[in-house]
Each structure stands twice: as structure tokens, then as C-alpha cells.
Curated annotation (Swiss-Prot):
Key words, A-Z: Cell cycle, Cell division
Protein name: Cell division topological specificity factor
Highest taxon of the lineage: Bacteria
Keyword Cell cycle: yes
Gene: minE
Keyword Cell cycle: yes
Family according to the record: Belongs to the MinE family.
Entry-linked InterPro entries: MinE (IPR005527), MinE_sf (IPR036707)
NCBIfam families: minE, PRK00296.1
Described function: Prevents the cell division inhibition by proteins MinC and MinD at internal division sites while permitting inhibition at polar sites. This ensures cell division at the proper site by restricting the formation of a division septum at the midpoint of the long axis of the cell.
Signal peptide: none
Gene Ontology biological-process entries: cell division; regulation of division septum assembly
Pfam families, alphabetized: MinE
């Protein structure tokens, strides 16, 4: 930044830059909204996990719960299985 930059008039934002900024806000909002929901692949993953477990142990599908917890830096896949005695 030079001393002459202080004397130059500030340019008004162009319509393209305004549109870009608005689009970035919309995309960020949609990503945030989508991250709060469960992922699309979770039901299929749950069924595949149940199928693998059933190869070794007879279980009911109601005994398996799969959750995804999203935090700021990472996502955690939580799998709880109630095993028969």
C-alpha cells in the first residue's frame, strides 16, 4: 500500500462482486443447513453394517443405532449395538 492509495477515491463495488458475495453467503447458509441434517448415505450404511454383523451374531435391526455428530473440525460416526447375551 502506498501513500497515494489514501488519496484515491474508493471504488463502488461492481454488480459482479456484489452477486459473488451474495452467492457465497447463500452457499455457506445451505452448507450449514445441510450439515445439521443426517447425511444421505447414512441409512444405506446402517443396513450394510447390520448385514455384516448378522453374519456373526443374530441381532434385530432395532438394536443398532447410528448417529453422526458434527463439530467445528470433525464429524464423528457413532455406532451403538445391543448384543444378545
Amino acid at each position: 500500500m502506498s501513500i497515494f492509495d489514501y488519496f484515491r477515491a474508493k471504488r463502488a463495488p461492481t454488480s459482479a462482486s456484489l452477486a459473488k458475495e451474495r452467492l457465497q453467503i447463500i452457499v455457506a447458509h445451505e452448507r450449514n443447513k445441510r450439515s445439521l441434517q443426517q447425511p444421505d448415505y447414512l441409512p444405506q450404511m446402517r443396513e450394510e453394517i447390520i448385514a455384516v454383523i448378522r453374519k456373526y451374531i443374530p441381532i434385530d435391526s432395532s438394536q443398532v443405532s447410528v448417529n453422526v455428530d458434527n463439530s467445528e473440525n470433525c464429524s464423528v460416526l457413532e455406532l451403538n449395538i445391543t448384543l444378545p447375551d
